[in-house]
Curated annotation (Swiss-Prot):
GO terms for biological process: enzyme-directed rRNA pseudouridine synthesis. It catalyses: uridine(1911/1915/1917) in 23S rRNA = pseudouridine(1911/1915/1917) in 23S rRNA. The active site is at D144. Keywords: Cytoplasm, Isomerase, rRNA processing. This is Ribosomal large subunit pseudouridine synthase D. One of its GO terms (molecular function) is RNA binding. The gene is rluD. Its main location: cytoplasm. Gene3D superfamilies: Pseudouridine synthase. NCBIfam families: rluA_subfam (TIGR00005). It is an enzyme of class 5 (isomerase).
Length: 326
């Protein structure tokens, strides 16, 4: 048994917090709330203060809950046939083209609509193969909710450990593409820094002189257009929000980044322009494979504001050829 903390924002008014929990999160039935010793805290003036579960909550309230979690919760997860394209699959691994807007694994406010739920639907033996896992069966590495693209998952624990060790040892080649605000003035380069939790907002990360963990990102300019740039990014380390933090630090925030970017009223419909384009990794027995996703549609739509159709098609064809061996 472990003690777990989760934060969420209330989406609608409710007469009681416990009723809101049981009505919105499948894992918190009325009996589960009592059995798991749920305690609740509400943010007030920047601090979380303890409240009773019988208290009413209102839309946009920020709530922190603490509860007991069993060592294995995989049986609580439900399979879900989420539309996710499969790039590659064999008996040990499955490589997905994760859509934007889908979490890699369940969290307090997303229990049935994540990559894990898709894996449980698609791989019937997943629960048996990961019976010692909690709520992340098959997840080797993670993409943020609004980051799309290549995501490799394991079908059994031995493969998960084999793949995860390659990420840990930096023996993979990961290439992302991003559209950033501003014309990039360096053709190629790198940024190395420490990344730590932000002092003022614990949900964010920031570059630090000497605190946190070392992070290294290599970048390559692909295209300057209008007031924007298209970049290829290679994270040589795997820190949370690394690419987004490094681009902000360079003063070229990723377009559509509501956390690290600038608010631009003219671009309200633009979502995060960050895409996991390519992954090279050994899938077993020295079988190194290169997995490439499609050039994302939202990138094409945005670029079409600056180029005619024939010209844009040629540009994308050339980019695809370049990125294949980058």
């Amino acid at each position: 048994m472990i003690r777990v903390k989760r934060e969420f924002t209330v989406k609608e008014n409710a007469l009681r917090l416990d009723l809101y929990l049981s009505g919105n999160f499948e894992v918190f039935t009325r009996s589960q709330i009592k059995r798991r010793n749920v305690e609740a805290f509400k943010k007030s003036n920047g601090k979380f203060l303890k409240i009773k579960l019988s208290k009413p909550v209102f839309k946009d309230d920020e709530i922190l809950i603490e509860f007991d979690e069993e060592s294995s919760q995989i049986d609580c997860l439900r399979p879900s046939n989420i539309p996710i394209a499969i790039i590659y699959e064999d008996s040990n691994v499955i490589v997905l083209n994760k859509p934007q807007g889908i979490l890699s694994h369940p969290g307090i406010s997303h229990w049935d609509d994540t990559v894990v739920n898709f894996l449980l639907y698609h791989i019937k033996s997943l629960k048996i193969n990961f019976n010692e896992e909690k709520i992340r069966p098959g997840i080797v590495h993670r993409l943020d909710k609004d980051t799309s693209g290549v995501l490799i998952c394991a079908k059994n624990i031995s493969t998960l450990r084999f793949l995860a060790q390659q990420f840990k040892d930096k023996r993979t080649n990961k290439v992302y593409i991003a559209i950033v605000k501003g014309n990039f003035n360096s053709f190629f380069g790198s940024i190395e820094s420490f990344i730590d939790r932000d002092k003022h907002n614990r949900k964010k990360f920031s570059v630090s002189k000497d605190r946190g963990k070392k992070a290294l990102t290599e970048y390559r300019l692909l295209l300057n257009f209008g007031e924007y740039s298209l970049l290829a990014l290679k994270p040589k380390t795997g820190r949370t929000h690394q690419l987004r933090v490094h681009m902000k630090y360079l003063n070229f925030p990723i377009l559509g980044d509501e956390v690290y970017g600038r608010v631009d009223g003219s671009l309200k419909k633009i979502t995060l322009m960050l895409h996991s384009y390519k992954l090279e990794i050994d899938v077993g027995k020295n079988s190194f494979k290169k997995f490439i996703s499609e050039f994302p549609k939202r990138f094409v739509i945005f670029l079409s504001n600056f180029y005619k159709s024939d010209e844009l098609n040629l540009i994308i064809d050339n980019l695809v050829l370049f990125l294949r061996d980058f």
